[in-house]
Regions:
Chain B
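Flexible, low-complexity linker and terminal segments
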Residues: 1-18, 27, 213-270
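Active-site-proximal loop->helix
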Residues: 116-121, 141-155
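Glycine-rich beta-alpha junction loops
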Residues: 64-66, 136-138, 194, 223-230
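Structural motif
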Residues: 57-60, 100-103, 128-132, 176, ...
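Short, hinge-like loop/turn segments at secondary-structure boundaries
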Residues: 76-79, 122, 147-151, 237-240
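Thiamine diphosphate
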Residues: 1-140, 203-207
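Conserved thiamine diphosphate
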Residues: 20, 147-214
Length: 355, 270
């Protein structure tokens, strides 16, 4: 199946309650697949095409207030429009899943794949001090799995979760193992999970619930911020996910996520045939970033190469983790160009080994 | 006991009660200025929800603007929306919980400027929600700047020489525009300048909530309102200014009273 179609299929099967979205290339198949599947007839899942990405994310905000599982998807320019609503959801501590199938920017940019929204996704993307859990799928299977995982994390931390895919993964066709259809949560389950904060109508035996990110008292607002930061610290302690490939004996390590990591896997094979001991660290969570494993290898290897489809964004997070202990270089292409494994191997030799 | 206390005790006997605060309004002192219409409209909404017995089903969506704190006063569940996005937020709530009662409460900047797109499309979809629109022709919370509904010649913080058509365009009669949309079931313009008007406004708000229960489409109630602080007039002068200047531009009355249009009128033939 195609990566974008799998997002829709996983949403239906994991019992998602609602999807709100607006068409944008290269991810329009998500909503098209949902509309073709007509899940409202089977499970009652709501699927609605909004008038804009702004409206989509605020529909998600409203629907998430009910304690139900709600999601949207878009691509880079659309995610910029959603930044307001994502910030509000982070501030109001509402769970949801947001898929960004990235394309090249800035501006209208291109419809070709890119990873240029790394900073936007991992540093919050909107105004205020907040972070999202950011999951970076490198296969169609992970597109599927991260929808399911995304909802788990969204409700564990009461936070928006972003699946940061790119045009390659969105359009890629691969075999995928789908989960069995799960029922949507019942009202009783929702009451148990979210009953302490959800706005479903004020029952006689409880105080009114108000979902807001507003607080005029600076001392309380600071406490709210500290609570968010504690949450992010807990994510850093408990949710870091990565894959380390052939790193045990490595003299050099490449760091790459999403489709760039797929290319680097091939580069590892090519370089090792040449006798270059290179490994690959693939961050699966971009926030929380796998800084510990990188810091550990920083004292063991001769250098890191960050490979990204952008101008060098993740490289800064690697440098922070490495903290000056070894060399950190960047190689990437922009504008929708996807480099070949040989091109990456050449950069590895040129920038890191001989550079 | 003083004579005064005796008299007060005589007066507050239950059998003398002719009017009481709605049980849905709490005792918090409202932050609204003297002469502001918000307090009256809050009271009407609280009364309607109480009288219809829908407190446990109702979710309010408060805006950005003076009424951002509406959630402090009416004892129901609330979601506070970003500036202008209340109709989208209400859409999200209503779509996943169609059995609940959902309303937005928005000012003119929120509903008719920054949130114009969300307003139009929610009404055009015929969302089964109630929208309460407070039009006082000025931005109250940010300190009295020009609103989309500010009248020509009206002085505000950003139109110190009065609103100028060449520079600022025209006052937006958004309610007339919304009445044209097939998704609208009930569109009305009310005010609360005297007891008779307050009674009519309450009837309109109640009707709007009843229309939601009947799933007839969007019910939209504009309330032409005062902003004494923004207009720099006392409450009595504000009412007079509203009657003399606002009512001719924003005439009161029903603009649409039916239900959302039959899809057949808009369908392809083949």
């Amino acid at each position: 199946m195609k990566g974008n179609e799998v997002i829709a299929e996983a949403a239906i099967r994991c019992g998602c309650d609602a999807y709100f979205g607006y068409p944008i290339t290269p991810q329009s198949e998500v909503m098209e697949t949902l509309m073709a599947q007509r899940p409202w007839e089977e499970s009652g899942m709501v699927v609605l095409q909004a008038e804009s990405e702004i409206a989509s994310i605020h529909m998600v905000y409203g629907a998430a207030g009910s304690g139900k599982r709600v999601m949207t998807s878009s691509s880079s320019p659309g995610i910029s429009l959603m930044a307001e609503g994502i910030s509000y959801m982070a501030g109001a501590e509402l769970p949801c899943v947001i898929v960004n199938v990235q394309r090249g920017g800035p501006g209208l940019g291109t419809i070709q794949p890119s990873q240029a929204d790394y900073n936007q996704a991992t540093k919050g993307g909107g105004h205020g001090d907040y972070s999202l859990v950011v999951l970076a799928p490198a296969s169609v299977q992970e597109m599927h799995d991260f929808v399911v995982l995304g909802f788990e994390l969204a409700f564990k931390y009461l936070t928006p979760v972003m699946i940061l895919a790119d045009g390659v993964i969105g359009q890629l066709m691969e075999k995928v193992v789908l989960i069995d259809q799960r029922p949507r949560w019942t009202n009783e389950q929702i009451a148990e999970i979210s009953g302490s904060w959800s706005t479903t109508g004020k029952a006689k035996n409880r105080k009114k619930h108000v979902i807001t990110s507003l607080e005029m008292d600076s001392y309380i607002m600071e406490r709210n911020n500290l609570r968010l930061q504690e949450k992010y610290d807990q994510m850093k302690a408990e949710e870091v996910r990565f894959e380390a490939i052939e790193c045990d004996d490595a003299e050099y390590i490449m760091v790459a996520f999403g489709s760039a990591a797929r290319i680097c896997q091939k580069t590892v094979q090519i370089a090792r045939k040449k006798g270059i001991k290179v490994g690959l660290i693939r961050p699966i969570t971009l926030f929380p970033f796998p800084e510990k494993i990188i810091a550990e290898y920083a004292t063991k290897v001769k250098g890191f190469l960050s490979v990204e489809f952008n101008a060098g964004q993740m490289v800064h997070d690697i440098r922070l983790a490495v903290n000056g202990k070894t060399k950190v270089e960047y190689f990437g292409r922009m504008g929708g160009i996807v480099p070949t494994p040989d091109e990456v191997e050449a950069a590895l030799e040129h920038k890191l080994i001989r550079g | 006991m003083s004579v005064v206390a005796d008299r007060i005790n005589e007066i507050i006997k239950p059998e003398n009660l002719v009017y009481a605060k709605s049980p849905l309004l709490n005792d918090d002192i409202m932050h609204y200025c003297p002469g502001c219409s918000h307090g009256v409209v809050h009271r009407l909404i609280a009364e309607v929800i109480d009288e219809m017995g829908i407190q446990e089903q109702t979710i309010g969506v408060s805006p950005v603007g003076c009424a951002v704190f509406a959630y402090n006063y009416i004892d129901i569940d609330w979601q506070e929306a970003a500036h202008g996005r209340a109709p989208a937020v209400a859409t999200g709530i209503k779509r996943v919980m169609p059995e609940k009662v959902v309303f937005t409460y928005q000012g003119d900047g929120d509903l008719a400027a920054i949130g114009t797109a969300e307003t139009f499309h929610a009404v055009n979809r015929g969302e089964n929600i109630v929208m309460i629109f407070i039009n006082n022709a000025i931005y109250g919370m940010t300190g009295g700047q020009m609103a989309p509904t500010t009248l020509i010649g009206q002085v505000t913080a950003t139109t110190p020489n009065g609103r100028d058509v060449d520079l600022n365009g025209y006052p937006l009669r958004i309610t007339e525009l919304l009445a044209q949309l097939p998704g609208a079931a009930y569109v009305t313009r009310q005010s609360v300048q005297n007891p008779a008007a307050v009674r009519k406004a309450k009837k309109a708000i109640r009707k709007a909530f009843e229309i939601q229960a009947m799933k007839k489409g969007t019910a939209f109630v504009e309330v032409v309102s005062t902003c004494s602080s923004g207009w720099k007039l006392n409450p009595v002068e504000s009412n007079k200014w509203m009657e003399e200047n606002m009512f001719p531009q924003y005439p009161l009355g029903d603009l649409k009273d039916s239900s959302r249009a039959d899809a057949g009128l808009y369908s392809i033939k083949g």
